[in-house]
Amino acid sequence: MRLLFVLLCCLAGAAHAEPARTPPPKAYLTLIIDDLGQNLPRDRRVLALPGPVTTAIMPDTPHATEFAREAHRAGKIVILHMPMDPATGPYAWHPELPLEELQKRLDAAFKMVPYTAGINNHMGSRMTAQPVAMAWLMGELQRRHKFFVDSRTSAQTVAAQQAQKIDLASVSRDVFLDDERTEAAIFNQLQTAISLARKQGSAVMIGHPYPQTLAVLERELPKLKAQGIEWIDIKQMISVRSNKATPAHGKNGIYR
């Protein structure tokens, strides 16, 4: 009788036990810092950030080659921050240039920035809206085994769309951290990226090596893990997204 009573108590306890909690869905962030190569002491703060930051280096800067080598030695992913119209300079792409000149400028830019795994556009609101040039670029990057990051400096961009058409490894930016250059605004943008990552599973951030941006990142990035956020590098993010557009950039995974 006593044994029966004990068994009944155990069964009653099991009936009221809390159900096993399902782990929260994964939330991934990746970070690109643009406009590098201009100021070595400043840019080295980017290399000291505690995680897999992607370094986007401009070819027409005084320290482009040297900093690319430093970033590579530091284990950071290096990408070419390719100037595009309305950017100016000897490497900049403009819609009126023939494809032969675009290739010449791209070749020269890659020579200035060694160890590149891919590229993203610097400015480029006019250039990334050009279907023919963007289709050519994506084919060229595929030939070179490099990926593309669409900075989405314009709502009219067709760059990621053209990359997706040929299944080139690519991803699009979700959040600019520092359009407003104050620590409070940058912190808020970081929180926006974190919220977006929780909502859609991932978020791609782009920032710049401004003192305010670096101060916020140095303070807040070490806290990501405790917030349930996994900071991954850009190659991992491309894999996570599988070349699919997020709802903000397309429909049913297809870029519009």
Regions found by a protein language model. Give the residues of each.
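Catalytic-site microenvironment of enzymes
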Residues: F5, H16-R256
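Sec-dependent N-terminal signal peptides
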Residues: L3-A12
